[in-house]
A protein has these predicted regions:
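Bacterial N-terminal signal peptides that target proteins for export
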Residues: 2-12
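Bacterial N-terminal signal peptides
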Residues: 11-22
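Sec/Tat signal peptide C-region and signal peptidase I cleavage site
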Residues: 23-27
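Zn-dependent metallo-beta-lactamase
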Residues: 28-104, 114, 316, 321
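Active-site HxH/HxHxD metal-binding segment of metal-dependent hydrolases
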Residues: 32-42, 48-49, 115-186, 279, ...
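Conserved beta-strand hairpin/beta-sheet module of binuclear metal-dependent hydrolase folds
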Residues: 72-128, 208-230
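Divalent metal-coordination and catalytic microenvironments
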Residues: 85, 99, 109, 142, ...
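Metallo-beta-lactamase
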Residues: 105, 112-114, 177, 186-188, ...
Length: 321
């Protein structure tokens, strides 16, 4: 997947910045006694943790106005099988996934509205040989409309929908206790267990889900992230930093080595390209498998970028005084 021009320029600019040698703060001081940029050492540190797959995340999260690749203008994507038991039935800019278990199907996210649920998700499932009537649970990773908008279509069919308590608020409130996701909660269908994590910051109740996937019979552990980008200022960034620490610890213990990106190339451009272009996939190569160590390094990079942004916000506020 090619980076768009805005992303490419951002990556080039940040590459120049972070490859500058670290010099004493007094030497970095500009003309007129301007204070040095205290965020630069953190940005440089984050850059050392990244690699080509995560440059898009680095460019997005290591500056205040990083490129936004999720533009809400996507079309229906080609439905495809990602693993033996995981399928994609979303759009080109935002995802919907189906996990197949021996106890039925689990749908993650529902696109923008009931019309997209009916015209994209359901036909996509049928094209892949999945029966929509076998859906046992619908999970909304968070309350933003591009993930939850199709929920009424599935609730009208009497399906169980699960959302975190905090994110049920914008959706009209939880209908019952069984509809609320709790941190560390495990839901099991057949032989498949799904572990939920609360990772607030993108919304007050964003969740992530961990579950086993199989690639030609080989077991892996996948993480489906609802959203990690903060939607607010310093306080929300600090919340995200805590959420990343929680995510890192839980995924390390679980051995997560597969990461599912919620949007177009927000986390990993190679992974999204793999999802979008099934006809270009190479035999015996699944680009969604990143490895446990690589993912842990990514969480460290992301946390460091968020710390840098906190410093940027503080410097911006100080400069305005």
């Amino acid at each position: 997947m090619q980076l768009n021009n805005k992303v490419a320029r951002a990556v080039l600019l940040l590459g120049i910045i972070v490859t500058l040698p670290c010099v004493p703060a007094t030497a970095q001081q500009g003309r007129g006694g301007r204070a040095p940029d205290q965020s630069l050492p953190l940005v440089q540190q984050a850059f050392k943790m990244t690699d080509a797959r995560y440059l898009i995340s680095f460019s997005r999260y290591c500056m205040l106005d990083g490129p936004n690749t999720a533009n809400g203008k996507g079309d229906a994507a080609t439905p495809s099988q990602l693993f033996d038991n995981l399928y994609y039935v979303g759009k080109t800019d935002v995802g919907a996934w189906v996990l197949r278990t021996s106890g039925g199907l689990v749908l993650f996210d529902t696109l923008n509205n009931p019309q997209e649920a009916a015209s994209i998700v359901v036909p996509g499932m049928r094209k892949l040989g999945l029966d929509p009537d076998q859906i046992k649970l619908v999970v909304l990773t968070h309350s933003h409309n591009d993930h939850s908008g199709g929920m009424p279509y599935f609730r009208a069919k009497g399906l169980r929908v699960m959302v975190s308590e905090a994110d049920w608020g914008p959706l009209g409130g939880a209908p019952n206790a069984d509809s609320v996701v709790h941190d560390g909660q495990i839901v099991t269908f057949g032989e498949t267990s799904i572990t939920f994590l609360l990772i607030p910051g993108h919304t007050p109740g964003t969740i992530a889900a961990m579950f086993p996937v199989f690639d030609r019979g080989q077991r892996h552990v996948a993480l489906l992230v609802g959203g990690i980008g903060p939607t607010g200022g310093v306080d929300m960034h600090r919340t995200v930093i805590n959420s990343i620490a929680h995510l890192s610890a839980a995924t390390k213990q679980a051995g997560v080595d597969v990461v599912i990106d919620p949007h177009e190339a927000i986390i990993d451009s190679a992974a999204w390209g793999y999802i979008m272009h099934p006809q270009e996939r190479k035999t015996n190569q699944n680009d969604l498998i990143v490895g446990a160590e690589r993912f842990q390094r990514f969480t460290q990079m992301l946390s460091t970028c968020m710390q840098a942004r906190v410093v940027m916000y503080q410097q911006k506020a100080d400069a305005a005084r």
